[in-house]
Amino acid sequence: MDPYLLLKAIGFFLLVIIGIPGNMFIIIQFVLVKIIEKKLLPTNIILTMLATANLLVIFSRIIFQLLNAIGLEDLLDESECKFMIFTYRVSRAMSIGITSLLSCHQCILLAPSTKVWSYLKQKVSQNAMTIIIILCVLLISMYSYTILISHARKNTTSSPYTLHLIYCDADFVTYTSYTVNGTFYLLRDLILVTLMILSSIYIVYTLLQHERNVRGIRSSDRGQKSSAEYKASRAVILLVALYVILFGLDNSMWVYMLTLSYVNPNMNEIRVFLTSSYASLSPILIIITNPKLKNKLKYSYAKKTLPKNATNNGLVFSISKSDNKDTIR
């Protein structure tokens, strides 16, 4: 097997085995919280929907990249190609949009309690799911054109403005439609990334102010609540940093490719790997920075590894009790 193909197969295989269990764990745990506690904090609603969007990215793109890397050809017919490309475009845009919403929501939570900010805090927190649904409907409408331009790969000569997407092609036919599509993608990502960065800058500034002001009151109830708020903020910053790094690497390669007269297909594969990595790597950050999820994972691990008599004596039960003290958003 060609060394590059082997490396590509291993890379996409790692994304699959990390991404699917990680996103599924987040979704299942927060669904259980909703069922048991009858409520779910707005931030956790956003994280659940982010994990759902990431899971769709994995199923609609990364798995097919893996299958292609190990040599499986011509797996999708015309209708399946349309569905796969449409699902990938919408779910990837949802993943970016929800990450941006998460950073903006956390920024609003940390904003001063003025009349305007208090109103925004209440409205955004109460309508987090509604905002996500509106975003989803908007993106479905915007990407409906992909159904028309997508088709299974053919042996005939394709248009010079055709994007080759694993088993399928997206044919834009004209230079104008090709450039409009590329410009739209770039502007969309730039706007959302700019919102993420601006929100994160404000969060970092607020965190620094917080460190100076609450050193003496960390033991109080207010200090504990505030500490939970700011731990959640740090988690959001890490997620944004991960996306911005991957976005920067991806678009740096894209700009470089524009300067070349001939683009090696391997460079496109690397870009796909970078753009898809967020869907698999972000669950790791979410789990290790969210105490509720982290404690659930520790409890599940302890339950499997402790002897049966230790479980019966209540050692595992004591671990699960500590999980109920978690107050983080």
Model-predicted segments: where are they?
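Transmembrane helical core of 7TM receptor-like proteins
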Residues: M1-R329
